Amino acid sequence: GVMVMCSSSLAAAMMMGGGEEKEDPIVPKTPPVLPKAQHVKIARPTGTYPTTAILNIAEIEVFDKVGTNIALNATVTGGPAVHSAGPWANLTDGDYANFAHTLNDGIAFMTIDLGAVKEIAKIVITNRAGYSGSTRMENATVKLLDASQVDVKTTEAIVGEKMKMTYDFNVATPAWVYADA
């Protein structure tokens, strides 16, 4: 029969063949240190509405290490102004069919207040329906801010946005993962 092994089993099997080599003790993997923040802010560099100064986002979900969306129904502020079609509260209401929408020139941003400093494992941004690839989030970054709004962590810029953008702090090298599903 054919033996199927995962890479760690394969390495162990290869190590056992030598006889003289001592097997390494099993060292538990250290879980990543997750960032802690009270505010989650998405912002684009300063620009002109409606081309480079705009955000319209269906939902931003912020998950803790047990997978709870700690941003659900959290208070949202933003600017430079709010578009009447997309009130801030839509960003965290759990409904992918509506959206929050900025208005006017300047720095387009939305900030979620988690209510207290909390450990953050993952952020999932759901784009406004029909806006995958629209560039309305191009070059936006997400900042995690402490209770005093001091920057704790900033993601790299979003480039080539899709329907879903996920940033997972549980992986060795966190980075945006883009998907249209």
Provide a role label for each language-model segment.
Residues 132-148:
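Short, surface-exposed beta-strand/strand-loop-strand elements in extracellular ectodomains
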Residues 19-33:
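Acidic, proline-/serine-/threonine-rich low-complexity intrinsically disordered repeat tracts
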Residues 60-62, 123, 142:
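Extracellular beta-strand elements of beta-rich domains used
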Residues 1-21:
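Single-pass alpha-helical membrane anchors
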Residues 42, 119-130:
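A short beta-strand element within beta-rich, extracytoplasmic domains
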Residues 31-37, 48-117, 128-135, 157-181:
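Disordered, acidic Ser/Thr/Pro-rich linker "stalks" and the adjacent N-terminal cap
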